[in-house]
Amino acid sequence: MERIIFHVDVNSAFLSWSAVKRLREDPSSVDLRTIPSAVGGDVETRHGIITAKSIPAKRFGITTGEPVVKALQKCPGLVLVSSDWETYRQSSQAFMAILCEYSGMVEQASVDEAYVDMTETVDARLLKNCSRLQGEPLRAAR
C-alpha cells in the first residue's frame, strides 16, 4: 500500500504564537498577524535579525534572517516584538499533540513542522464514506 504522508507547517510560527498570546492577555490589542510586524532582535536597541514576520510585513519585502535595522528601513512602522521561547515551546507541544490526534505516526521536523503518516486515517475515513454512500462494502460488491 502506498503511504500518505502530510507535511504540516505553521506559517510564521513565532509571530503567530506571539500574536495569539498577546490577544489572550489583552483581547483589545491589535492582532500582530494583521499589521506589519516581526519577531526578533532586541526591541529596545533595534539590533539583531528578523526570525518571523507577518504577511503584511512580507509585502514590504521584509525577509526572515535580515537585520532588524534593514527591515525598519523598508517599513518604519514595523512593530517589533521580542522572542518568547517559553511560549514557542508550549505552542509547539500543543501543535504536536493535535497532530497526534490524527495519527500515531508523527515525525517532528522542527519546532513548527512535522511529517504525519495519514495512511490509516485516510483509509478509515474513505471506508466510512464508502459505507455511507454505497452501503456495506461486501453487500455493495455482490
Model region roles, listed by residue range:
Residues 1-139:
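Residues that scaffold, gate, or flank divalent-cation-dependent active/transport sites
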